[in-house]
Design a protein with these regions (language model features):
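Duplex nucleic acid-engaging cores and interfaces of nucleic-acid transaction enzymes
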Residues: 1-113
């Protein structure tokens, strides 16, 4: 699993990136309900998790965009001109019986160009 630190406006953000279904599954099962989960919409991709204890609407848009870009760059969609990334609080993400697969409610969306 890859981890990255991101500084924005004097705040340090921690980001985790699952590189395969086992790591993705581990992220889903161990992340806090307030962490923010990112995934390429309607295709397989890495799971990106922003460690967080704030409300989603309090996170700067630049931080959300950074996580979405990491999600795109770690997916099979990395060479596409436009890529739709879904993101939501981990409280809305549930593991299924299939390793690395999830069900999601309460989506927000961002288009990465």
């Amino acid at each position: 699993m890859k981890e990255e630190q991101f500084f924005f406006n004097d705040t340090n953000y921690s980001i985790k990136i699952g590189k395969n279904k086992t790591e993705n599954d581990h992220l889903v099962k161990t992340s806090a309900k307030t962490d923010i989960w990112f995934h390429v919409n309607n295709t397989s991709s890495s799971h990106v998790v922003l460690l967080n204890n704030e409300k989603l609407n309090k996170i700067p848009k630049q931080v959300i965009k950074r996580c979405a870009c990491l999600c795109k760059s770690n997916s099979s969609s990395k060479s596409e001109l436009k890529c739709e990334i879904i993101y939501t609080e981990m409280a809305n993400v549930s593991a299924t019986e299939h390793e690395g697969q999830v069900t999601v409610n309460g989506l927000s969306k961002i288009i990465v160009i």
